[in-house]
Amino acid sequence: MILTFARSLYTQGQYNGKIREYFYYVSHNGFLFLDDSRMKNFTAAYKDIQFLNFFYRKIKENKTGRYEDTFPWVSLCGIERNFLRCDDTPLVYTELDSTEKELRIGQSTIYHSFQPSSLSMNSSGRVYHKCPIGGKALVADKLTDKLYRRFRFDDDGVPVGFQCGEQIIELKK
């Protein structure tokens, strides 16, 4: 219902004065789609690395006065506004590099520093990591599955630590 409502608010590529506007969606798996695409699966996701890198580097909170409730994020590109809504967070970490020092954003080649102590898990089991945009980024399910065995839990099932090599890193509450 919300998607149908959002679609009726805009037309892809519409002009607002001299500013062209596009509308995007980020899934919980870190894939970027045109918001109004019917099929939101791997084949429909953006794969152009240069575009993804540019798009993700420019994301900020939407304070444009347009679509702020429906599209809380925006990626500005010259005279274009790329409005963004997301399943959870605007950035999603999809991969931990082989050195375990950096997390990859979506399908881009942008990495942020991995800080195990900043991991957190909500009551539904979703895992988050500190992020400069929005304060935290979702860790994609596929990566969470790989990391899950390294979490340490208290008697109530709350994650309290994360194993890095021989060391257990205490998680912040």
From Swiss-Prot:
Signal peptide: none annotated. It comes from the Eukaryota. InterPro entries: DUF4505 (IPR028108). Coiled coil: none annotated. Belongs to the UPF0598 family. PANTHER family: UPF0598 PROTEIN C8ORF82 (PTHR31449:SF3). This is UPF0598 protein F59C6.12. It comes from Caenorhabditis elegans.
